[in-house]
């Protein structure tokens, strides 16, 4: 085996390892979105059971003022989220650790926004409940992304040290700067929360349209939940997986370049993977 074939084989081994790792990340993303969907489904079903009569519930009915009991129920739910977050933060001695379950600063900001802007009617209360579920889910996503990107960066530093025969760049601060770097004017965490905003808008749109028609058992079962299920478990989940793959590729490439630069290398041969696009394939062996 000549030198070029050796390096191709070595890179292919790493590619297969990455594929297996990303399959596990995809499974965890699926779990997060499944939990989010189930909680949202429960909230919508609870809303229907609480307010609908024999004919269902109309938009006018949904916009009636809510009772103090309804407000207390929402407040208790929000309090549970915050208390659990505080407990997790205390258990971690207040340190920032993406493996912990406490809310990120972004998640806390989103929750404050929901609390501040909630109108006192049934529909807005439902939206607030759904908002809590989306905040919790996207907070989990942000932590998963952070862990995955940091691990990929550190692994690549270690791998490049083995290839280049030099000291491992095991610098957590350097890894953090790569993971949280702006890419096309946004950090990975910004993109996670932008996805939450898009989901929120889409769910509110679906619910409002259903209430205009009259939210009844048939509408709920045949129109509302299938749309929401597709939006969450297919569209948004797939988008999250694509985003993570893109970000993993970005941090791995940046870690490679940092390793080359730190060790004085300014030339390299580009090896395109089998599934590369036509533009990247044109650079193979260049």
How would you describe each model-predicted region?
Residues 1-230:
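N-terminal leader/targeting and assembly helices and adjacent pre-domain segments
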Residues 231-286:
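Acidic, glycine-rich two-metal-ion catalytic cores of nucleic acid-processing enzymes
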